[in-house]
């Protein structure tokens, strides 16, 4: 049984010039995840459920657990003295860590994706993305360090809190998964070099918004629902409402996750920096694809911290089909 710490150190030996800082950074995220896991498991017993009464910069109601998870991860990252600053879905602006001006890395995160599911005991997750800063070490980080295309990510991953808690991450050399053993307090290697199955037969989308979808997405959904034995259609519809949980299932079983633009959200709803980029990095490393309907997600150059994007991610042939339908049936 190999632990996450042992696995990271083992991989570090493959790179003679590695300093161990990235290893320590991922260890900090691991610690934050263990704390969040502990408190999610007793969420119904303590007062951390429901809305906080505070709105974020996008005007969305923040849940108590969103803020709690944000503070725990922020504290874990700051304590290591490696991260120069963070950007979070729950923070209006970047957070600069004083006294860590020499830190090489910045972290972007969605501390608790799908937190509205907590009240009904459905899987939620943490998403993280790591970049090397581009401003000179020894100075405070700026927004420039965070507004990098996803192709510049050093590492990315997620933690899914479900029937078991699992940490899945990549540093650009495959996707690896570790399952948390609460009796030992360690994450143990459960899957190495994960890939999407060759073919996917599941689509994940909130079809309640169907009337607001672009014409190309509507046509693709009808394609998914048509009967065709040669392509094993109709496909199965599975939607949890937590990006991490939906992505994780499709990674294991094969499928596509779709969150298109709508009339009410013409730029899409998911955040490019905190959700789309890290999941796109993982998808490509697992042999899949991620797109905004026209462009590769990892090629997009962000302009603002909380920029949104349409998002299509999963098996490459399914994402390719979605792009084709969007090209063939453009909205007027």
From Swiss-Prot:
Q: Does the keyword Magnesium apply?
A: yes
Q: Which residues bind substrate?
A: 113-116, 206, 239, 257-259, 269
Reaction(s) the record says it catalyses: beta-D-fructose 1,6-bisphosphate + H2O = beta-D-fructose 6-phosphate + phosphate
Name the residues that bind Mg(2+) 1: 89, 110, 112
The cellular location(s) given in this protein's UniProt record come to: Cytoplasm
Q: What EC number(s) does the entry state?
A: 3.1.3.11
**What keywords appear on the UniProt entry?**
Carbohydrate metabolism, Cytoplasm, Hydrolase, Magnesium, Metal-binding
Gene Ontology cellular component terms for the protein in this record: cytosol
Instruction: Kindly provide the name given to this protein in its UniProt entry.
Output: Fructose-1,6-bisphosphatase class 1
Organism annotation = Erwinia tasmaniensis (strain DSM 17950 / CFBP 7177 / CIP 109463 / NCPPB 4357 / Et1/99)
């Amino acid at each position: 049984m190999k632990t996450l710490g042992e696995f990271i150190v083992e991989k570090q030996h493959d790179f003679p010039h590695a300093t161990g800082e990235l290893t320590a950074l991922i260890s900090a995220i691991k610690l934050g995840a263990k704390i969040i896991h502990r408190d999610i498991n007793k969420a119904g017993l303590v007062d951390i459920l429901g809305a906080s009464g505070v709105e974020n910069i996008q005007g969305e109601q923040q849940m108590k657990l969103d803020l709690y998870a944000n503070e725990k991860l922020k504290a874990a990252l700051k304590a290591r003295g490696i991260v120069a600053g963070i950007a979070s879905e729950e923070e209006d602006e970047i957070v600069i860590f004083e006294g860590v001006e020499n830190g090489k890395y910045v972290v972007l995160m969605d501390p608790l994706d799908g937190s509205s599911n907590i009240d009904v005991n459905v899987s939620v997750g943490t998403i993280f993305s790591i970049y090397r800063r581009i401003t000179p070490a020894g100075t405070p980080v700026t927004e420039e360090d965070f507004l990098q295309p996803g192709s510049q990510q050093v590492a990315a991953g997620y933690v899914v809190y479900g029937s078991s808690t699992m940490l899945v991450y990549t540093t650009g050399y495959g996707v690896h998964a570790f399952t948390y053993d609460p009796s030992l307090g360690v994450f143990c290697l459960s899957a190495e070099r994960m890939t999407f199955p060759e073919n996917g037969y599941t689509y994940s989308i909130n079809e309640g918004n169907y009337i607001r979808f672009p014409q190309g997405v509507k046509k693709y959904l009808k394609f998914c629902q048509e009967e065709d034995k040669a392509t094993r259609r109709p496909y199965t519809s599975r939607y949890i409402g937590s990006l991490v949980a939906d992505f994780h299932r499709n990674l294991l079983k094969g499928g596509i996750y779709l969150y298109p633009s709508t009339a009410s959200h013409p730029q899409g709803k998911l955040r490019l920096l905190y959700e789309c980029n890290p999941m796109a990095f993982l998808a490509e490393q697992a042999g899949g694809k991620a797109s905004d309907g026209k462009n590769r997600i990892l090629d997009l150059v962000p302009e603002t911290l909380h920029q949104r994007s349409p998002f299509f991610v999963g098996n490459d042939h399914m994402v390719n089909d979605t792009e084709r339908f969007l090209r063939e049936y453009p909205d007027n």
